[in-house]
Design a protein with these regions (language model features):
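C-terminal capping alpha-helices of c-type cytochrome domains
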Residues: 87-129
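Gly/Gly-Pro-rich "capping" loops immediately C-terminal to redox-active cysteine motifs
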Residues: 32-36, 47-88, 106-109
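The canonical Cys-X-X-Cys-His
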Residues: 35, 39-48, 121, 125
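Short, low-complexity, disordered segments immediately C-terminal to signal peptides
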Residues: 1-8
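Electrostatic cytochrome c docking/interface patches
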Residues: 8-38
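Short, basic/glycine-rich phosphate-binding loops at helix/coil junctions
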Residues: 13-16, 71-74, 102
């Protein structure tokens, strides 16, 4: 696929959780302690504290939240109009390669290719302490 073709590839449907690596969240035993360590990469742009938006929105309470819904945060139109609700499974897909799931998102992070790392970050975000 050429770079031009890649940029026009449609996002998976909002209710899809298919990953590029064909893994599922349920296939991993998540470790929130390791997830907190991996989340250190995310802290360049995100906080896990409620109401603390940075370059990216706060990820406190992200699970179950509609994408692009924190009042006062300047989301991309792609994110606001994605129709996504952040279930653990959808986050697992998104964190693999954010631009694939929400083309046009402001999030420039290329993703976490390892399914275990994604599962661990999600476990941490469920209860960030």
């Amino acid at each position: 696929m050429t770079p031009a073709a890649a940029s026009t590839t449609a996002a998976p449907p909002a209710d899809s959780t298919d990953t590029l690596d064909k893994t599922t969240l349920a296939s991993f035993t998540a470790d929130p302690v390791h997830g907190k360590q991996i989340f250190a990469q995310c802290q360049a742009c995100h906080s896990a504290e409620p109401g603390k938006n940075m370059i990216g929105p706060s990820l406190a309470g992200v699970i179950g939240r509609k994408a692009g819904s924190i009042a006062g945060f300047a989301y991309s139109n792609a994110n606001k109009n994605s129709g996504i609700t952040w279930t653990p499974e959808k986050l697992f897909q998104y964190l693999e390669k954010p631009q694939r799931v929400v083309p046009g998102t402001k999030m420039t992070f290329p993703g976490l290719p390892k399914g275990q790392d994604r599962a661990d970050v999600i476990a941490y975000l469920k209860n960030p302490t």
